[in-house]
Amino acid sequence: MKKTILSIILAVVATVTATAQIKVEVSETVELMSILARTAGYQEYSMDLAGQYTKDTEAWFAPYKEHVAVVLAQDIRAKYGIGHERVMNMAIHLGIDNGKIVLIGDRAELNNGWQNVDLDDFVKRLNKFYKDTRFHEFFEQHRQFYDDYTKMYEANVMPTFHPEWYSQFHYGTAPTDRFHVIINFTCGGNSYGLCSQLSGQPRDLFAIIGYWIDPALGRPRYDASVLFHEANHPFVNPLLDDDKNIKLMEKVGPKLLSLHQSSVEKTNYPDWRIVINESLVRAAVVLYMQDAGYKMEQCLNVLGLEMVQKGFPWMFDLVGTLRYYTAHRDQYKTLNDFYPDIARCLEQYVNDLERKTGKTIN
């Protein structure tokens, strides 16, 4: 009995400590890459929902729309599809050393289009953009603005975030990764979950959360479920890099993509692999909320939103399947071990739908 009580106390202390150690940050390289993308006309970085900060950004950087770095950013978007999380993938692989932008980490992690880019030339032009625009001066002028919001986010959202849940849910182990929560003041309603690995260091997990002002409220809006969502991506996305798992999903994936695209007016997900990953991440958020003690009504609201408005009508089935996984961890040590069951769940959903409608999904 004493051991049980001690274990509970130690678990609570570990949880509080883990959360307390995660400081909400602003990253100069995240803002740099985001503002470069905005100046180059990337739509997903041009939502312009940050009020006065957006106005300041436009006034400061508009004169540089013909800059060599901006022209290159436009070129690599057109040729290689660089955008969305790929921009942020570059951002987390950049550092600033004595006022100079440098690449850090493993270049092989810069894929999905970046492998086709001359990275040395890109960084050279990015340094010129950094210097010519006096970017650091802009960044420091807004330091108080950044700090005020990160403190607000820290106070209101971080107490609901339990990083140890993720390693336990996905791996069945205690946490070994390092979480970073970064506010992106340029990407508006978009947020991203990424990871990187420095040699000899724990894996770094990044939840990059978009800042936006709700026009109806006239103040910044933050939703804790966005953090819960993005924190899952570094665990879920690598599973579909495995050829074995790709083979499991390659038939049902395109059908789910077709269903998703037909159920929403506009989607940011043009590839079936993204839809599979998003499905798992969104289902995991519901389980997280259940395990974190959210009211059933709140969990059902999130589930209903994903099914009806977000274009993932199979979410109810997937949440049930993942709950089976959590109840049988003696059989499935990791989510990767359970991946064949996930594929079967999604296949069953599609088969049932085709049978009910009498139509084949293409």
Feature-to-residue mapping (PLM):
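Auxiliary, metal-adjacent structural segments of Zn-dependent hydrolase domains
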Residues: 143-201
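Post-HEXXH active-site segment of zinc metalloproteases
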Residues: 238-264
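Long, mid-chain structured domain cores
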Residues: 70-163
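Bacterial Sec-dependent N-terminal signal peptides
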Residues: 1-22
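Active-site scaffold of zinc-dependent metalloenzymes
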Residues: 102-113, 186, 191-221
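Active-site recognition of the HExxH zinc-binding catalytic motif
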Residues: 221-242
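N-terminal mature-domain "stem" immediately C-terminal to a signal peptide or N-terminal signal-anchor/transmembrane
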Residues: 21-101, 310-335, 339
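Pan-zinc metallopeptidase signature
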Residues: 283-362
